[in-house]
Regions:
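N-terminal targeting signals for export/organelle localization
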Residues: 1-57
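Short, surface-exposed patches at the edges or C-terminal ends of soluble domains, predominantly
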Residues: 32, 95-100, 144, 185-194
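Short, ordered coil/turn segments that flank beta-strands lining enzyme active or ligand-binding pockets
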Residues: 61, 71, 163
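Conserved beta-strand segments of the P-loop GTPase G domain that flank and frequently precede/overlap
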Residues: 76-79, 111-114, 140
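Structural microenvironment flanking redox-active thiols in thiol-disulfide oxidoreductases
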Residues: 84-85, 89-130
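Short, internal strand/loop/helix patches
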Residues: 109-111, 124-157, 161
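Thiol-/selenol-based redox modules, centered on thioredoxin-like
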Residues: 154-155, 160-194
Length: 194
């Protein structure tokens, strides 16, 4: 049995017409069945529920942190007590990330937030002021911190806050700083705010 040109054209037209409908049907079936890829492209821990900045009640050297928003993407690092060698390593990494962002570095602010009271030694404060002049210092009460951050407090975690004041990604020292840089570049490239 041979197909005439007329029938062959109809089959091609039907295939072209039905392919998008079939793809739509299959994608809907996969979505509602719960099937989805397991991996994500972000390197930090994506918080199930974003941490709203207004609930944290930060105070920074330039005033309450929520007054800064809407504004810039923010890398917020937490420290419990004085800034140790591990703390300074993460400060150095966040500064290098900011430098490597090049033209987008002005879209990102960095904060070091101390718990309960400013327990940084004079030597730490002097080192921060000389080596990290663009770093903002701040305070937060321990009971205002969400459990996700408290669990990682020993690692001087980073919290990435979007320009609208939502903490969305959490990073710890086990993750190389290049991973935070990759996430930031992706976010800055695709963001219409900040």
């Amino acid at each position: 049995m041979t197909l005439s040109k007329k029938n062959y054209g109809r089959i091609i037209a039907a295939a072209i017409f039905l392919t998008p409908i079939l793809l739509l049907f299959l994608s809907t079936a996969f979505y509602y069945s719960g099937y989805s890829p397991e991996g994500t492209v972000n390197k930090g821990t994506l918080l199930e529920k974003p941490i709203e900045l207004k609930n944290l009640k930060f105070t920074v050297d330039s005033g309450p942190l929520e007054n800064e928003f809407p504004g810039k993407w923010s890398i917020v690092q937490f420290v419990n007590g004085d800034c140790t060698e591990k703390c300074f390593q993460t400060l150095y990494s966040s500064r290098q990330i900011n430098i490597r962002l090049a033209k987008d570095s002005g879209r990102v602010a960095r904060y070091l937030i101390s718990l309960d009271s400013l327990k940084l030694s004079e030597a730490s404060l002097l080192k921060i002021k000389t080596e990290y002049p663009l770093l903002h210092l701040g305070l937060i009460e321990r009971n205002n911190l969400p459990q996700e951050v408290l669990n990682k407090l020993e690692d001087s975690p980073y919290l990435l806050i979007d320009p609208l004041g939502n903490g969305i990604l959490l990073y710890d020292l086990n993750l190389p700083s290049g991973e935070l840089l990759k996430d930031l570049k992706k976010l800055l490239q695709n963001s219409k705010i900040g």
